[in-house]
């Protein structure tokens, strides 16, 4: 004879978010001991999280607050639209803004109420049955403009940008954030492009031009032209502005009296 009631099952479901059958089994296994049933479900949830470790987390959202930007991943867009998942992301980014962690591991140890970020993520993962992953975090401590972009009106933001800058023209900084979101700049200036990347681009440009049958004496000029094309695509300050393609981003920032010191761009599921 069962040592628990339907009300016990309902209460356990409300507390843990586990399914009805799982709650009934947990109560049966523990002879109706509610606290032990809760523990059993948490243990099972933790084990399930481990089993989910190999699943892909290509969905999710980005969130920003007070100079902090995070990416929190899940497996499906159904969960990305889930209110509890979005609330968790808001709590995580608030914890990041408060704690200013150096990296994801440090953020996982930050507090959300009486739990750590890592515990809060694991508990929601166990509850909804999907792998959840805190993928990355960025913290800027200067004057910051944040921009979040939605790919679809029914989905949470999937692209997030932080721009740290000096100057008083917030509108110009916002325009730069939009630029970064749209055109995916990778570097702020030429000086920020790693030497091995430049060498690789130069080598590719030279080999391509040679394969096209270009005259050997013309190769240096052709290579420099193509390398400049790479910089105009990858370097923020050298990109043509989306608001005025006859001017570079640097030219417009100079007029506005704004200097971008650094930026970061997160896109869900992308490097």
From Swiss-Prot:
Region (Involved in Mg(2+) ion dislocation from EF-Tu): 76-79
MF GO annotations: translation elongation factor activity
Entries under Pfam families matching the protein: EF_TS
Subcellular compartments: Cytoplasm
Cross-referenced PANTHER family: ELONGATION FACTOR TS, ELONGATION FACTOR TS, MITOCHONDRIAL
UniProt record similarity statement: Belongs to the EF-Ts family.
Function: Associates with the EF-Tu.GDP complex and induces the exchange of GDP to GTP. It remains bound to the aminoacyl-tRNA.EF-Tu.GTP complex up to the GTP hydrolysis stage on the ribosome.
Stated name of the protein: Elongation factor Ts
């Amino acid at each position: 004879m069962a040592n628990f009631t339907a009300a016990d099952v309902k209460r356990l479901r409300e507390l843990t978010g586990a399914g009805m059958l799982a709650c009934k089994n947990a109560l049966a296994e523990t002879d109706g001991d509610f606290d032990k049933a809760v523990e059993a479900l948490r243990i099972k949830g933790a084990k399930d999280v481990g089993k989910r470790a190999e699943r892909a987390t290509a969905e999710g959202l980005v969130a920003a607050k007070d100079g902090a930007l995070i990416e929190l991943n899940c497996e499906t867009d159904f969960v990305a639209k889930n209110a509890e998942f979005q609330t968790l992301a808001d709590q995580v980014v608030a914890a990041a803004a408060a704690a200013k962690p150096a990296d994801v591991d440090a953020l996982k140890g930050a507090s959300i109420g009486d739990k750590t970020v890592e515990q809060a993520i694991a508990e929601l993962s166990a509850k909804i049955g999907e792998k959840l992953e805190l993928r990355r975090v960025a913290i800027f401590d200067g004057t910051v403009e944040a921009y979040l972009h939605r790919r679809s009106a029914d989905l949470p933001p999937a692209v997030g940008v932080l721009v740290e800058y000096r100057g008083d023209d917030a509108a110009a900084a916002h325009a730069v954030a939009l630029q970064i979101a749209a055109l995916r700049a990778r570097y702020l200036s030429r000086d920020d492009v790693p030497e091995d990347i430049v060498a690789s681009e130069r080598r590719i440009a030279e080999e391509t031009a040679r394969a096209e049958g270009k005259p050997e004496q013309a190769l240096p000029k052709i290579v420099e032209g193509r390398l400049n094309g790479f910089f105009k695509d990858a370097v923020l300050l050298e990109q043509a502005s989306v608001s005025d393609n006859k001017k570079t981003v640097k030219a417009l920032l100079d007029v506005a009296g704004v200097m971008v010191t650094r930026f970061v761009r997160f896109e869900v599921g992308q490097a």
